[in-house]
């Protein structure tokens, strides 16, 4: 499917359930890899070992003392990702959310934007997900181009000194990171825990 066969418009009320399922599916595709990445870092392994050692004095089962900290840590990572990316965002100053629609009317992607925290930060992508059945067909790039156009228009209307777009990407989503780098974005830090990055932030001056 060529990008020219796609259109982007605001999400309709009756499309909310479909879009929400798409967001949840997108998070599920990466949450296990992010959890594995986070929990195999040396500081995390030390903390898990210390927690297991402490639980051995409380729990009668050695296996339970070993597995319980891992289970709780994985659950915390997954719940954090689902809360951040697996739900519909409230309407923001940039409008939306928007959906990518094929010529046949099938919704195949979703995008949401929000203003940056401080003046000059530009706009941020808060949701970007493509249905697994429509990936590698130009949907992500079409949504990204739409986001850039919205960010430029918003910056001009607000009198911002520059137009800028920031896209957060889970560390395990290598395909998205490669697409952004191919579109001229640069990785600039991110956030995580214990000194290790779980989400990278890519930015581009427009």
UniProtKB/Swiss-Prot annotation:
- Bilayer disposition of the protein: Single-pass membrane protein
Q: Which residues cross the membrane?
A: 57-77
- Would the keyword Transferase turn up in this protein's UniProt record? yes
SUPFAM superfamilies found in the cross-reference section = Acyl-CoA N-acyltransferases (Nat)
> Any idea which UniProt keywords this protein has?
Activator, Acyltransferase, DNA-binding, Membrane, Transcription, Transcription regulation, Transferase, Transmembrane, Transmembrane helix
EC number(s) in its UniProt entry? Answer: 2.3.1.-
Give its localization: Membrane
Q: Name one GO cellular component term.
A: membrane
Q: Briefly, what is this protein's role?
A: Probable acetyltransferase.
The UniProt similarity line reads: Belongs to the camello family.
- Give the protein's recorded name: Probable N-acetyltransferase 14
Origin species? Homo sapiens
Gene name for this UniProt entry: NAT14
């Amino acid at each position: 499917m060529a990008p020219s066969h796609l259109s982007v418009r605001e999400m309709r009320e009756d499309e909310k359930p479909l879009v929400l399922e798409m967001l949840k599916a997108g998070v599920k595709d990466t949450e296990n890899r992010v959890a594995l990445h986070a929990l195999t870092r040396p500081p995390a392994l030390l903390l898990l070992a210390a927690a297991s050692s402490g639980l051995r004095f409380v729990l009668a089962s050695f296996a339970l003392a070993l597995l319980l900290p891992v289970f709780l840590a994985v659950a915390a990572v997954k719940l954090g990702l689902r809360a951040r990316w697996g739900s519909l965002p409230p309407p923001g100053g940039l409008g939306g959310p928007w959906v990518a629609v094929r010529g046949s009317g099938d919704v195949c992607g979703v995008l949401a934007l929000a203003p940056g925290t401080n003046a000059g930060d530009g706009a941020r992508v808060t949701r970007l997900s493509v249905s697994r059945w429509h990936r590698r067909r130009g949907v992500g790039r079409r949504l990204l181009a739409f986001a850039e156009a919205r960010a430029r228009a918003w910056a001009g209307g607000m009198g911002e000194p520059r137009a800028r777009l920031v896209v957060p990407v889970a560390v395990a989503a290598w395909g998205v990171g490669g697409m952004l780098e191919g579109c001229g974005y640069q990785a600039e830090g991110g956030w995580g825990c214990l000194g290790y990055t779980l989400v990278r932030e890519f930015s581009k001056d427009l």
